[in-house]
Design a protein with these regions (language model features):
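N-terminal non-globular leader segments, chiefly Sec-dependent signal peptides
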Residues: 1-76, 115-127
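Short, compact, well-ordered microdomains
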Residues: 76-120
Length: 127
């Protein structure tokens, strides 16, 4: 018996509706390259939180793999491109395929309201 350890990380399967929205987003095309597509998104503390699909930096260990929960770095701007919202961070662009039920869209509206003219990013080092 080999000495192997198998780790299973929490993974959420995408629903048919989410996959359909992702396909529509991929078909639409975007002005700049997209890092990943996110489902079930809510914005909390200037970061996007959702379930990732098609991340460009997925590695051999499953980091950023489809179905994994992701917390983006600070969102610099959120704007609508065609039928979809795009979250832009320092190094990435995430397309929102679906919002979290109940408070996802409300969190985007709140982010847009609070971020107008105010850019107070998370400090790199806490004192």
């Amino acid at each position: 018996m080999p000495n192997t350890i198998e780790l299973s990380f929490h993974v959420k399967r995408h629903t048919d509706f989410e996959l359909l929205r992702i396909i529509k987003a991929q078909e639409q095309g975007f002005e700049e390259p997209v890092t990943a597509f996110l489902c079930g998104v809510a914005i909390r503390a200037r970061t996007g939180i959702g379930i990732v699909f098609g991340h460009k930096r997925e590695d051999q260990y499953g980091r950023f793999g489809d179905g994994h929960l992701i917390r983006t770095s600070d969102v610099i701007k959120a704007e609508r491109e065609g039928r979809f919202w795009v979250l832009t961070t320092v190094n990435s662009r995430y397309v929102i395929a679906t919002f979290q039920r109940g408070n996802g869209r409300a969190s985007l509206r709140e982010f847009l309201r609070l971020s107008q003219g105010m850019h107070h990013f998370t400090p790199r080092v806490l004192q």
